[in-house]
Curated annotation (Swiss-Prot):
UniProt protein name: Assembly factor cbp-4
UniProt keyword annotations, A-Z: Chaperone, Coiled coil, Membrane, Mitochondrion, Mitochondrion inner membrane, Transmembrane, Transmembrane helix
Transmembrane segment boundaries: 15-34
General function of this protein: Essential for the assembly of ubiquinol-cytochrome c reductase. It has a direct effect on the correct occurrence of the Rieske protein, core 4, core 5 and apocytochrome b.
Pfam family, one: CBP4
Organism this protein belongs to: Neurospora crassa (strain ATCC 24698 / 74-OR23-1A / CBS 708.71 / DSM 1257 / FGSC 987)
Topology versus the membrane: Single-pass membrane protein
Family (UniProt): Belongs to the CBP4 family.
Organism placement in taxonomy: Eukaryota, Fungi, Dikarya, Ascomycota, Pezizomycotina
Coiled-coil spans in chain: 98-118
Length: 125
């Protein structure tokens, strides 16, 4: 029977230490190098800082609306993208009906004005 090969403990120790250094050190190095939001903001030129501050509330509101819609969509059994497409279609139809009713109201107003002109009555403002 052949003798067993001895285990190369030094090789395994180097491998484990190297793997641990990569697994722990890589993310730690990335975390250390990534600038914070404040550091990025300080690197903006003054005009961009001003514009960013002006639009901050608006962007936060848009994000909050987006998250609220996502929560609402996730309550459905359907996939989110399907529910989102249905909601967009419903909103598009609503806008079209509103535009149609506004056009109809303008047409009615124009007819009334034409009738008042024909009758010689004063026009409404």
């Amino acid at each position: 029977m052949a003798a067993k090969k001895p285990v190369n403990w030094w090789l395994w120790t180097k491998m484990l230490l190297g793997g641990a250094a990569i697994c722990v050190g890589g993310p730690a190095f990335t975390y250390w190098l990534t600038p914070t939001d404040e550091e990025l903001f300080q690197k903006y030129n003054p005009e961009l800082q001003k514009r960013s501050l002006e639009r901050r509330f608006e962007r936060q509101q848009e994000f909050d609306d987006f998250v609220t819609k996502l929560k609402e969509y996730s309550k459905s059994d359907k996939p989110i993208w399907t529910v989102q497409a249905e909601a967009e279609e419903k909103e598009r139809q609503q806008r079209a009906s509103v535009q149609k009713s506004l056009a109809l109201a303008d047409e009615v107003k124009a007819r009334k004005e034409a009738m008042r002109r024909e009758a010689g009555l004063p026009l409404e403002k």
